């Protein structure tokens, strides 16, 4: 027999599906939420639903956007000759926090991982190749987390792009298997400054 009422148990179950939320955190969040005023919960639910319905992907770089082009792609002050390739929108956010990078981005939407059934076809690799060729990009910076999948993706994408442009990768002060989103701004800034050509 559960100590929770069915609606509360269902809420806890759904909260546990969020990244980094275990049973105890889900319980704490659920109990907090049900004690909030109904108007506050309604506003929260409305904001959540609106974000899900209105936030999509930029048609150029595949970063998060509620319009055809994201804020970064629309910014005329950005260096349009440089594209930083990342796996996930969280990586764009992490790099933007450094305030060091002034170019554009391309979000692959994941990493090549044959064990998980993810090949280049499931990612935005071909869109990147077309973009680099059409826009006559001067440099592509590979800013992919250092893992087996990250290395595979970096080398694969780098080989495809070499006929069109200079391909570099950020230098890493990150441990192998570390994620960009967890790195501090100083580490990321140094990694951008220390990038080197892909061999």
UniProtKB/Swiss-Prot annotation:
> C4-type zinc fingers: which residues?
58-73
Pfam families this protein is in? RecR_C (PF21175), RecR_HhH (PF21176), RecR_ZnF (PF02132), Toprim_4 (PF13662)
Q: Which residues form the Toprim domain?
A: 81-175
Q: Please name the GO terms of the biological process aspect recorded for this protein, alphabetically.
A: DNA recombination; DNA repair
| GO molecular function terms noted in the UniProt entry | DNA binding; zinc ion binding
Indicate the family of this protein.
Answer: Belongs to the RecR family.
**Full protein name:** Recombination protein RecR
- What species was this sequence derived from? Synechococcus elongatus (strain ATCC 33912 / PCC 7942 / FACHB-805)
Organism lineage reads as: Bacteria, Bacillati, Cyanobacteriota, Cyanophyceae, Synechococcales
